[in-house]
Amino acid sequence: MKKSYRIKKESDFQRVFETHNSVANHKFVIYQMQKPNQPHFRVGISVGKKVGNAVQRGWVKRRIRQTLLEVKPELKQDVDFLVIARKSAADLSMKEIKKNLVHALTLAHLFEEK
C-alpha cells in the first residue's frame, strides 16, 4: 500500500481516536473519522505488545495490509481509520484474518454502498 494511504503521525492517530467513533469484533477494533475533502482513505495499523513477540506482530501487520489491499477498491474514500489488532489475532491464519477484518470493516460501514 502506498505511503499516501497510511497514517503515520502520532497527531493523526490521536485525532482519529478522539472521535470515539469505533466498532469492534473479537479480533479487531476499528476507529474511523470522516474526511470529506480527501481523495482516498488513509489507514493506521496498530498491533500492541500484548500480541505475541515482534515477529508475530509484524506478521499480523503484513496480513492486515494485504487484506486491505485486496478490498481497497470497495472501501469508502473519504475516511481515515485505524485497525487495532487484539491479542487473539496472533493465532489466526490469513484466511481467518481476512474474514474477521472484513467483518469489522462491514460493522464500521467502511464499504461503498452498491
Curated annotation (Swiss-Prot):
One MF annotation (Gene Ontology) recorded for this entry: tRNA binding
A GO BP annotation: tRNA 5'-leader removal
Family membership noted in the UniProt record: Belongs to the RnpA family.
Chain's role: RNaseP catalyzes the removal of the 5'-leader sequence from pre-tRNA to produce the mature 5'-terminus. It can also cleave other RNA substrates such as 4.5S RNA. The protein component plays an auxiliary but essential role in vivo by binding to the 5'-leader sequence and broadening the substrate specificity of the ribozyme.
Lineage top rank: taxon: Bacteria
GO cellular component, one term: ribonuclease P complex
Nuclease in keyword set: yes
Self-association state and partner proteins as the record states: Consists of a catalytic RNA component (M1 or rnpB) and a protein subunit.
Keyword set includes tRNA processing: yes
Annotated catalysed reactions: Endonucleolytic cleavage of RNA, removing 5'-extranucleotides from tRNA precursor
EC number from the UniProt entry: 3.1.26.5
Entry keywords, A to Z: Endonuclease, Hydrolase, Nuclease, RNA-binding, tRNA processing
Upper lineage: Bacteria, Bacillati, Bacillota, Bacilli, Lactobacillales
Protein name in UniProt: Ribonuclease P protein component
Enzyme class: hydrolase
